[in-house]
Amino acid sequence: MHPEPAPPPSHSNPELPVSGGSSTSGSRRSRRRSGDGEPSGAPPLPPPPPAVSYPDWIGQSYSEVMSLNEHSMQALSWRKLYLSRAKLKASSRTSALLSGFAMVAMVEVQLDTDHDYPPGLLIVFSACTTVLVAVHLFALMISTCILPNIEAVSNVHNLNSVKESPHERMHRHIELAWAFSTVIGTLLFLAEVVLLCWVKFLPLKRQAGQPSPTKPPAESVIVANHSDSSGITPGEAAAIASTAIMVPCGLVFIVFAVHFYRSLVSHKTDRQFQELNELAEFARLQDQLDHRGDHSLTPGTHYA
């Protein structure tokens, strides 16, 4: 009998521990996972936000809306302050200019003592000048009294300082000064220009026997007789021309003032409707917030 052949030598060392292969394969798997995904030292992901119930969501929405409403109210107050300041500045400049011009026009006008003025012309001219100066000085007085207080508040860089401004309480006085300076004062100024033209040019007329330096005496007499027969002197013609020009300008001014006022009122009305809609939305949210405990909520009614 032949002896049995020895088994072939094994490539693996039987004396090596079995745990070595498992540790090597585990390190390979860990390196593979670390190479494929995030590094092993990365912080864990934050937990998802907790579910918000419907009453809590209503409360958060209401607080956010009220915060936005507070900021919008402050912005609206600042816009009103800047608008009031601009109106007062424009009123003061316009009133000072037009009243000064009216005073100079009344003082510098030279009346012809030899001319027989119509009885009502000088009275109307004097009354118009006096009312014009009084209206503009009243608007200038309001602007001078209120404007420094508004300027002092507008120069302070603080959002809450708008409450210290008197523009809300003095709103009617500001609008009155604006109307006196821009509407009534401008119309009186146009009338003042027309009356000044009549007072200045009405005495100008050519004498019947006065020769003209550029024409022969015979021709001057013919022209003078023609002007006397027509009944319109050169001064009257100049006054009538100025009146014919100023009357359409006054009508255009009145139409523009009415159109501007209607457009401004329409814009303010639209803004009031928008604010009323916002207040209705606030009231709805407040009502839902007040009655959130009256309705029983199921556990599944959540907003993620």
Curated annotation (Swiss-Prot):
Identify the main location: membrane
**Would the keyword Aminoacyl-tRNA synthetase be found if you checked this record's keyword annotation?**
no
In this chain, composition skew of type Low complexity spans: 12-27
The answer to keyword 4Fe-4S applying to this record is no
Family annotation (InterPro entries): CRAC_channel, Orai_sf
Q: Which GO terms describe its cellular component?
A: basolateral plasma membrane; cell periphery; membrane; membrane raft; plasma membrane; plasma membrane raft; synapse
How activity is controlled: the entry says:
Oxidation at Cys-197 leads to inactivation of channel activity.
Q: Which residues lie on this side of the membrane: Cytoplasmic?
A: 1-89, 143-175, 259-304
Summarize what the UniProt record says about post-translational modification. N-glycosylated. N-glycosylation inhibits channel activity in T cells. Ubiquitinated.
Positions of transmembrane segments: 90-107, 122-142, 176-196, 238-258
Positions of region (Disordered): 1-50
Q: Where is this region: AKAP5 association region?
A: 39-61
Where do the record's region annotations for Interaction with STIM1 lie?
72-92, 275-295
Query: Site positions for Confers selective permeability to Ca(2+) ions, renumbered to this chain?
Result: 108
Which ranges are annotated Pro residues under compositional bias? Answer: 1-11, 41-50
The record's similarity note reads: Belongs to the Orai family.
Subunit comment: Oligomerizes in homomeric and heteromeric ORAI complexes. Native CRAC channels most likely consist of hexameric ORAI heteromers, implying that diverse ORAI1, ORAI2 and ORAI3 subunit combinations with distinct biophysical properties can operate in a cell-type specific way. ARC channels are heteropentamers consisting of three ORAI1 and two ORAI3 subunits. Interacts with STIM1 and STIM2; this regulates channel activity. Interacts with CALM; this may displace STIM1 and STIM2 and might thereby modulate channel activity. Interacts (via N-terminus) with AKAP5 upon store depletion.
**Which purpose does this protein serve, as stated in its record?**
Pore-forming subunit of two major inward rectifying Ca(2+) channels at the plasma membrane: Ca(2+) release-activated Ca(2+) (CRAC) channels and arachidonate-regulated Ca(2+)-selective (ARC) channels. Assembles with ORAI2 and ORAI3 to form hexameric CRAC channels that mediate Ca(2+) influx upon depletion of endoplasmic reticulum Ca(2+) store and channel activation by Ca(2+) sensor STIM1, a process known as store-operated Ca(2+) entry (SOCE). Various pore subunit combinations may account for distinct CRAC channel spatiotemporal and cell-type specific dynamics.
Domain topic, free-text comment: The Pro-rich region of ORAI1 (residues 3-49) functionally interacts with the polybasic Lys-rich region of STIM1 (residues 672-685) and regulates CRAC channel gating at negative membrane potentials. AKAP5 association region (AKAR) mediates coupling of ORAI1 to AKAP5-dependent NFATC2/NFAT1 transcriptional responses.
Q: What is this protein called?
A: Calcium release-activated calcium channel protein 1
Species name for this entry?
Mus musculus (Mouse)
Lineage, uppermost ranks: Eukaryota, Metazoa, Chordata, Craniata, Vertebrata
